[in-house]
């Protein structure tokens, strides 16, 4: 998993509350377990005018030229609600997003973001509203998300502070998913297995 330290990038605006996981990545695209290849289907029903995904909807915000290459998504309350599907953060990350800024998230989606190397930042509703205004009126300006300092710096330099669990922060900062965390204990696991073989050898008789 790629470490998350400081993200300095274009922020795209999605001015919709209660965006559910079926809107993030529709169910017909959940036919594989690899984490790549989902970005093209992100927000499919909003991004495209046809089922085949060949005609872009010019009215959808992410299709605007100003948001090309965006790595930060700023959106509204209760983002990621609906059914539990890890494909939702996969699709967002595969599209290019590394951080999301919103007033609130659905719990399962929130947890899945951390497990997949993406930072879901929670700011107050009025702070998100201010960022919406600043980003919309400063075309080409970038937003900075600093995990170490736990800050978001807006286009005009104003700083917003956010909270993050210390363990999740450690994992993101060091690029550790569940497998990576387990591998860090590989030597201790080996020591345990060695002792267990001596005490309970029948467990390894196969």
Curated annotation (Swiss-Prot):
PANTHER family: 3-ISOPROPYLMALATE DEHYDRATASE SMALL SUBUNIT, 3-ISOPROPYLMALATE DEHYDRATASE SMALL SUBUNIT 2-RELATED-RELATED. Heterodimer of LeuC and LeuD. Belongs to the LeuD family. LeuD type 1 subfamily. Pathway: Amino-acid biosynthesis; L-leucine biosynthesis; L-leucine from 3-methyl-2-oxobutanoate: step 2/4. It catalyses: (2R,3S)-3-isopropylmalate = (2S)-2-isopropylmalate. One of its GO terms (molecular function) is 3-isopropylmalate dehydratase activity. One of its GO terms (cellular component) is 3-isopropylmalate dehydratase complex. The gene is leuD. This is 3-isopropylmalate dehydratase small subunit. Keywords: Amino-acid biosynthesis, Branched-chain amino acid biosynthesis, Leucine biosynthesis, Lyase. Signal peptide: none annotated.
């Amino acid at each position: 998993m790629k470490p998350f330290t400081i993200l300095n990038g274009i922020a795209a605006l999605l001015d919709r509350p209660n965006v559910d996981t079926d809107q993030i990545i529709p169910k017909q695209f959940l036919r594989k377990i690899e984490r790549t290849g989902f970005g093209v289907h992100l927000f499919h029903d909003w991004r495209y005018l046809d089922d085949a995904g060949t005609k872009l909807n010019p009215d959808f915000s992410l299709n605007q030229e100003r948001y090309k290459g965006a790595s930060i998504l700023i959106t509204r309350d209760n983002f990621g609600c609906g059914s539990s599907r890890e494909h939702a953060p996969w699709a967002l990350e595969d599209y290019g997003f590394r951080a999301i800024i919103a007033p609130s998230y659905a719990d399962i989606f929130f947890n899945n973001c951390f497990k997949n190397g993406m930072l879901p930042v929670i700011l107050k509703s009025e702070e998100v509203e201010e960022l919406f205004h600043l980003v919309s009126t400063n075309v080409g300006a970038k937003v900075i998300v600093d995990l170490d300092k736990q800050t978001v710096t807006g286009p005009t330099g104003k700083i917003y502070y956010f909270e993050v669990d210390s363990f999740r922060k450690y994992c993101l900062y060091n690029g550790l998913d569940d497998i990576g965390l387990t591998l860090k204990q590989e030597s201790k696991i080996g020591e345990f297995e060695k002792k267990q073989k001596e005490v309970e050898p029948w467990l390894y008789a196969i």
